[in-house]
Amino acid sequence: MMKTRSNPSLLWAVGVGCAVALGLATPAPLAAQEAGLPVCAECHAETVAAFAVTKHGSKLDATGQICQACHGDAAAHLDDPEGAKPPHVFGDAMTAGAKTAVCQSCHDGNRQLAFWESGKHRKNEVACSDCHSIHGKRAEPSITPYLTTQRKLEYETCGECHKSIRAQLNKTSHHPILEGKVACSDCHNPHGALSPAMVKEESTNQLCWSCHTDKRGPFVWSHMPVEENCLSCHNSHGSNVPKLLTVKVPQLCQDCHGSAHGQYAYGSSFAVGGANQNNASRFDARSCVNCHQLIHGSNAPASRGLFLVR
């Protein structure tokens, strides 16, 4: 049988946190340091209990040194808890740059931070602690142990600043972000990227094709707007038009193809070889894609492919 090894400090912190939450215990006085209990937990038991189940907290030790790694030398604070604060309290008086510098003292070599200096978040005074809950989520239990943020709630974190985009997620056609199948970080690198919207790929199309591989091509007959930018026709975050289109068909098609079938008024019927006069032959609704179905590109021979028809 495999033997497991427990972390006494971790078990103690979790136990104290539960006791405090139930009203069965109160933080021990400072003199309890002599008993070897975690120093910071004597006053901050609830915070330590939440912190203990994060990735940072897995390095918790009985001396409280892990706390000083971020908050700085706490000697003066221990001597006078009410009158002296640690050097770094991460409050409003501390600049975003100063907060981030503390995190970078350990995470500076992280490859995800390679473009942090050129990213929009840094330029807009966003600090690591604005997005990451360093002490853990105390209001809700962590879905996966040792994570400082929860993937399920990621869109809510981003939505605190990006409110207009958060609203688009409630539209009838949207990426399954609310359903938990797609996360903001699947497309964007919040720590910085070379692209304007901090997308993970070099271009919007490269990003979209990473999932929608059937639209990549190459095709014998290409639809040039598709090759240029998927966002020419689609709104990536949400739309009230099916398939995330920016506007309805045929208006969307007419933005470029204004002269196509110009002899027919909108809503009128027109003859289609071998077809009856029904909704399939009316110049409205899905009329364009009833015939031109291969709008992302076609490998059909001769002129059928040229016009992207099925």
Locations of regions flagged by a protein language model:
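Intrinsically disordered, low-complexity proline-rich regions
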Residues: 1, 15-18, 56-59
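Short sequence/structural segments immediately N-terminal
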Residues: 28-310
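Bacterial N-terminal signal peptides
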Residues: 12-25
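N-terminal secretory signal peptides that target proteins for export/translocation
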Residues: 1-10
